[in-house]
């Protein structure tokens, strides 16, 4: 017993000494310099390099009674006090203890360098386990693994209780995942902003400017606005009047059958200028028309000349115009299906256009009629109409041979007569037709050596026949030697001989 007391007194004395020593050292600790940052040890510290086995070892100090292990000897001595076993604590010597630092045994690690050594044994052990050891502990909620048990316990307490929300709306339960995602999200947003800035510099109008037409026209205005009908040009020469002349109708027929009229802005511009359209028609047929002739002929209300050019009973093929404008140049309702044309040459009017997209096709040749049929038709038309309509009913169309060309001479302009070869008088109103009916026309005069009366050739020897007027005309149609019908010699004299 006295030994135990001595031991106890000794221990208590040591404890008291140590306690008094601690009390004496406490004022001195106030004047110590601040701790260095981790990895920046004191240059005078002792550098200790431990083996990986020593760093990974746990419970180096084991209790012989309960076999409980401890990492430090002091912890084991304190544990022994619980078993009423003798225990001994190391006394702090009065000498200044040299500070110890620990380096990582892995050569490639940052903390392998003595200048980056760690000043705590526990710190170097945890570092080695975290960076170079095996991760043994796994979280049941997020399946994250840990090499240090204390880290795993700390994570298990807060796992699932705190959420990290990114600006894009994504939720994260782990802070490290949130940090990684946020870095990627910020980089993506910065790249998008950069591309937008570049596109704005390259195409400023596309990005900033709106279409003024769209702004001016609202959807309601677009829906309420009625669809405009396709614009079709009105009548060619003059606006329709109650007493319309035959010449105006003939000009309409010529323009509709010769010109490829389309529903275009050009036709709309020329709808108030008949001279332009007639000039185009004359160029297509081969006539020479001047503006003065057009103005004079336009004021002429007697339609005899134009009536001889085109028959009022022409077939619908003569009125073939663009189907894009059906209301343009509409034919009369009293038209008959067949024409009294003496010409079989389809190249006089040129190809017509029925539909703008289709190709041009020539008109089919009209069947020839005998002289008897022509006379009967002339008698019928003469009984129902005036002189102008009689000649217009004949439907005599001029055609010449390939060797004969139309003259461009001013004295024999073919535009006012439209194929008759009658001289143009600037101030006259139908005088040419009157002279023809009375027999005083220069057509039958001695100066006219050759008469090309719409395809009815006349020999030089017959130029002296000046009497008769209309009877001479019918006589020249019906018989007599030296008449070359159509001027091309396609039919013999037997076909046109008078039947008595």
Swiss-Prot record:
Residues where Zn(2+) 2 binds: 166, 168, 181, 185
Q: Where is the composition biased (Basic and acidic residues)?
A: 207-216
* Described function: Transcription factor promoting the transition to germination by regulating light and hormonal signaling during seed maturation. Acts as a positive regulator of phytochrome and/or gibberellin action.
Sorted UniProt keywords: DNA-binding, Gibberellin signaling pathway, Metal-binding, Nucleus, Phosphoprotein, Repeat, Transcription, Transcription regulation, Zinc, Zinc-finger
The positions annotated for binding Zn(2+) 1 are 139, 142, 155, 159
This one is known as Zinc finger protein ENHYDROUS
Zinc fingers, CCHC-type, are found at 164-187
Q: Which InterPro entries match?
A: C2CH-3rd_BIRD-IDD, C2CH-4th_BIRD-IDD, C2H2-2nd_BIRD-IDD, IDD1-16, Znf_C2H2_sf, Znf_C2H2_type
What are the protein's GO molecular function terms? DNA-binding transcription factor activity; transcription cis-regulatory region binding; zinc ion binding
CC per GO annotation: nucleus
Gene that produces this protein = ENY
Renumbered to this chain, region (SHR-binding) spans 174-186
Compositional bias segments (type: Low complexity)? 8-21
According to the record's subunit comment, the protein's assembly and interactions are: Interacts with the DELLA proteins (e.g. GAI/RGA2, RGA, RGL1, RGL2 and RGLG3), acting as coactivators.
Task: Report whether DNA-binding shows up as a keyword of the record.
Answer: yes
The cross-references to Pfam families, in alphabetical order and at most eight, read:
C2CH-3rd_BIRD-IDD, C2CH-4th_BIRD-IDD, C2H2-2nd_BIRD-IDD, zf-C2H2
Primary localisation category: nucleus
User: Region labeled Disordered — which residues?
Assistant: 1-42, 196-236
Q: What happens when the gene is disrupted?
A: Plants lacking both ENY/IDD1 and IDD2/GAF1 have a decreased responsiveness to gibberellic acid (GA).
Q: Report, as the record phrases it, the tissue specificity of this protein.
A: At 3 days post anthesis (DPA), expressed in the chalazal endosperm region. By 6 DPA, expressed in the endosperm and embryo. In fully germinated seed, strongest expression in the root tip and not detected in the cotyledons. In 4-days old seedlings, restricted to the vasculature of the cotyledons, the shoot apical meristem region, and the root tip. By 8 days, restricted to newly emerged leaves.
Q: Which residues carry this modification: Phosphoserine?
A: 51
Q: Where is this motif: Nuclear localization signal?
A: 124-131
Kindly list the biological process annotations in GO that this record carries.
gibberellic acid mediated signaling pathway; regulation of DNA-templated transcription; regulation of gibberellic acid mediated signaling pathway; regulation of seed germination; seed maturation
């Amino acid at each position: 017993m006295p030994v135990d007391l001595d031991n106890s007194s000794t221990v208590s004395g040591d404890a008291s000494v140590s306690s008094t020593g601690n009390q004496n050292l406490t004022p001195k600790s106030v004047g110590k310099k601040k701790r260095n940052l981790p990895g920046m040890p004191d240059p005078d510290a002792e550098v200790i390099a431990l083996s990986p086995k020593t760093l990974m070892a746990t419970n180096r100090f084991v209790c012989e009674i309960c076999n409980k292990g401890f990492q430090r000897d002091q912890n084991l001595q304190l544990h022994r006090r619980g078993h009423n076993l003798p225990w001994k604590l190391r006394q702090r010597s009065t000498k200044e203890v040299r500070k110890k630092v620990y380096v990582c045994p892995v050569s490639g690690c940052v903390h392998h360098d003595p200048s980056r050594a760690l000043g705590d044994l526990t710190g170097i052990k945890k570092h080695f386990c975290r960076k170079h050891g095996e991760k043994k502990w796994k979280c049941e909620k997020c399946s994250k693994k840990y090499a240090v048990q204390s880290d795993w316990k700390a994570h298990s307490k807060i796992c699932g209780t705190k959420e990290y929300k990114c600006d894009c709306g994504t939720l994260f339960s782990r802070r490290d995942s949130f940090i990684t995602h946020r870095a990627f999200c910020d980089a993506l947003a910065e790249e998008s902003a950069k591309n937008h800035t570049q596109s704005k510099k390259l195409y400023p109008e596309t990005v900033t400017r709106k279409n003024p037409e769209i702004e001016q026209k609202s959807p309601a205005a677009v829906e309420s606005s009625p669809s405009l009908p396709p614009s079709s040009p009105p009548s060619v020469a003059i606006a329709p009047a109650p007493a319309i002349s035959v010449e105006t109708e003939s000009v309409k027929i010529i323009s509709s059958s010769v010109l490829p009229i389309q529903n275009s802005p050009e036709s709309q511009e020329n709808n108030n200028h008949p001279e332009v359209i007639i000039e185009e028609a004359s160029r297509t047929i081969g006539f020479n028309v001047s503006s003065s002739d057009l103005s004079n002929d336009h004021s002429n209300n007697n339609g005899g000349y134009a009536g001889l050019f085109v028959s009022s009973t022409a077939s619908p093929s003569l009125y073939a115009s663009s189907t894009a404008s059906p209301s343009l140049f509409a034919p009369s309702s009293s038209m008959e299906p067949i024409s009294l044309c003496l010409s079989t040459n389809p190249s006089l009017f040129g190809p017509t256009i029925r539909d703008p997209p289709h190709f041009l096709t020539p008109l089919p040749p009209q069947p020839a009629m005998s002289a008897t049929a022509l006379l009967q038709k002339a008698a019928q038309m003469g009984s129902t109409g005036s002189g102008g309509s009689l000649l217009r009913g004949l439907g005599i169309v001029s055609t010449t041979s390939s060797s004969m060309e139309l003259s461009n001479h001013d004295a024999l302009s073919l535009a006012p007569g439209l194929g008759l070869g009658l001289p143009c008088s600037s101030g006259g109103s139908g005088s040419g037709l009157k002279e023809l009916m009375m027999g005083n026309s220069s057509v039958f005069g001695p100066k006219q050596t050759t008469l090309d009366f719409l395809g009815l050739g006349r020999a030089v020897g017959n130029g002296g026949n000046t009497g008769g007027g209309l009877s001479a005309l019918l006589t020249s149609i019906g018989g007599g030697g030296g008449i070359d019908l159509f001027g091309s010699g396609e039919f013999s004299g037997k076909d046109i001989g008078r039947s008595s």
